[in-house]
């Protein structure tokens, strides 16, 4: 029997008198086939260390611990720590850290792996309400995670992996794809969770690029430009950029020069630009002193 078997999950919750907290976005997966598929997608073996976020009662952790060198699981809910100590008692390669992943010094914890030089993968069922902040926090942490295989709301997975000229494409797609390749591996129906969420989930596989997707003069400025270009999706690039940089004649002249340098027309929409075009635009705007 597995932790994720529905009857076992119910028994664990009842034995510990656990009640779900909506503020933590808790939905526990009760399908062992999907858990195995997650581990297979992440290609976990004994030469890999794993960071897990939000282990819950340990359903995914159990599968990870069986396959990985070590698992470090970050759980914000104190009430789950004794439950995890119970459900994972047979594993000596799991460390549960009762902390908010957004507030810890990750490098310090990673140094505590028995073999910190092994590749580190992030495998997690992320809370819906905080998926994007967690992902960007990890991606921008400077820690060279080799791969992320994470479950999230299907809509968010679609946005992250979206390509130009699609409805889902936006600044989040660019922010992630600058650092990583992103592809939806498979869909997880809402019916396999306790309690069932209102929407379906997706497993997103992201692999770190050896170098960022494009070369830019100023990364921070590049991301500011991409965000500004999608503030009003139905507006043209020109309208979004003048809203962000200003509408004085001097600014307009600089914007016109930058668009010409980047080989872009003013009435194009942000969703039509790929990372290469945004890199050209960002560098051109920078060269105009904007």
Curated annotation (Swiss-Prot):
It comes from the Bacteria. It catalyses: adenosine(1518)/adenosine(1519) in 16S rRNA + 4 S-adenosyl-L-methionine = N(6)-dimethyladenosine(1518)/N(6)-dimethyladenosine(1519) in 16S rRNA + 4 S-adenosyl-L-homocysteine + 4 H(+). Its EC number is 2.1.1.182. It holds the Pfam family RrnaAD. It is an enzyme of class 2 (transferase). GO terms for molecular function: 16S rRNA (adenine(1518)-N(6)/adenine(1519)-N(6))-dimethyltransferase activity; RNA binding. PANTHER family: DIMETHYLADENOSINE TRANSFERASE (PTHR11727), DIMETHYLADENOSINE TRANSFERASE-RELATED (PTHR11727:SF7). Specifically dimethylates two adjacent adenosines (A1518 and A1519) in the loop of a conserved hairpin near the 3'-end of 16S rRNA in the 30S particle. May play a critical role in biogenesis of 30S subunits. This is Ribosomal RNA small subunit methyltransferase A. It comes from Streptococcus gordonii (strain Challis / ATCC 35105 / BCRC 15272 / CH1 / DL1 / V288).
């Amino acid at each position: 029997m597995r932790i994720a078997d529905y009857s076992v999950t119910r028994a664990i919750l009842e034995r510990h008198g656990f009640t779900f907290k909506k503020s933590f976005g808790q939905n526990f997966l009760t399908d062992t086939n999907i858990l195995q598929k997650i581990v297979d997608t992440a290609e976990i073996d004994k030469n890999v260390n794993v960071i897990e976020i939000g282990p819950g009662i340990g359903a995914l952790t159990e599968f990870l611990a069986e396959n990985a060198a070590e698992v470090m699981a970050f759980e914000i809910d104190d009430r789950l720590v004794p439950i995890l100590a119970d459900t994972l008692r047979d594993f000596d390669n799991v460390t549960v850290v009762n902390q908010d992943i957004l507030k810890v010094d990750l490098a310090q914890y990673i140094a505590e792996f028995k073999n910190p030089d092994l590749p580190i993968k992030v495998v997690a069922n992320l809370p819906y309400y905080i998926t994007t902040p967690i992902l960007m926090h990890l991606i921008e942490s400077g820690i060279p995670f080799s791969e992320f295989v994470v479950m999230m709301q299907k809509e968010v997975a679609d946005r992250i992996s979206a390509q130009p000229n699609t409805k889902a494409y936006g600044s989040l797609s660019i922010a992630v794809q600058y650092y990583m390749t992103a592809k939806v591996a498979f869909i997880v129906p809402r019916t396999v969770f306790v309690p069932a969420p209102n929407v379906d989930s997706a497993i997103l596989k992201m692999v770190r690029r050896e170098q960022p997707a494009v070369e830019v003069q100023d990364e921070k400025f590049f991301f500011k430009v991409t965000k500004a270009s999608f503030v009003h999706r139905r507006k043209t690039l020109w309208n979004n950029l003048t809203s962000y940089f200003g509408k004085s004649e001097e600014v307009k002249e600089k914007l016109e020069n930058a668009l010409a340098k980047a080989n872009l027309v003013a009435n194009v929409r942000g969703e039509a630009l790929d990372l290469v075009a945004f890199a050209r635009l960002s560098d051109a705007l920078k060269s105009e002193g904007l």
